[in-house]
Design a protein with these regions (language model features):
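Class I S-adenosyl-L-methionine-dependent methyltransferase catalytic core
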Residues: 1-41, 52-68, 73-199
């Protein structure tokens, strides 16, 4: 098997569409004020199904995870450390774990946290001027009738966002605009909560 970006991402997180859908259903069933160590990760599998391979493209300290494969010195250094961290895992996971520990980790906003905040404050329309990997969007999507407008400049994410919105029949209330949000005239939008997390 060749090491394509898609293959690499699946070797680290091989999430089926069914697993992703189940994760979204669990998020939709999460009650207000019920987040704990057992369920605060709910929703991340769903997002990783769509966005994980793109998260691996993000450069931290000058290197994306994919860049490591092109840099023999860095690869050897990280794989050596990865083998010590997780000697029984496959080499790609060893490399990924070492990358996250020694280079950096590209995290997502927890959809469960976003959902809980929305349930607590009861907004009708969210404005998010830095949508990123979709955590706040998915929190909004999980609540019927809640509107969300997000902005992001990473056009590579458009196809995945479109799939999420279309497959959940939420195009009437969930919107993502791929543009620099500083160019938007927010006075033309209707929203009663601004909730964002810039990079």
């Amino acid at each position: 098997m060749s090491l394509t970006k898609n293959n690499i991402s699946k070797m680290i997180k091989n999430i089926s569409l069914n697993d992703a859908k189940n994760d979204l259903e669990n998020l939709k069933n999460l009650k207000k004020k019920s987040i704990n160590s057992d369920n605060y990760l709910i929703g991340l599998k769903y997002l990783d199904y769509f966005f994980f391979k793109y998260r691996l493209e993000t450069r931290l300290k000058g290197y994306s995870f994919y860049d490591v494969f092109k840099n023999k010195e860095l690869y050897n250094k990280l794989i050596k450390r990865g083998r010590k961290l997780n000697p029984y895992y496959n080499p790609i996971i060893q490399l990924y774990d070492a990358y996250r520990l020694y280079i950096g980790s590209n995290n997502q906003f927890r959809p469960s946290v976003a959902r809980n905040i929305y349930l607590y404050f009861k907004p009708t329309s969210i404005l998010d001027f830095s949508a990123g990997w979709g955590g706040r969007m998915l929190g909004a999507l999980s609540i019927p009738d809640l509107k969300y407008t997000g902005y992001d400049t990473n056009k590579k994410l458009k196809k995945s966002y479109d799939k999420i919105i279309t497959s959940n029949n939420t195009s009437d209330r969930i919107k993502i605009k791929f543009m620099d949000s500083s160019k938007e005239d927010f006075s033309k939008l209707k929203y009663d909560m601004v909730f964002t997390s810039p990079p």
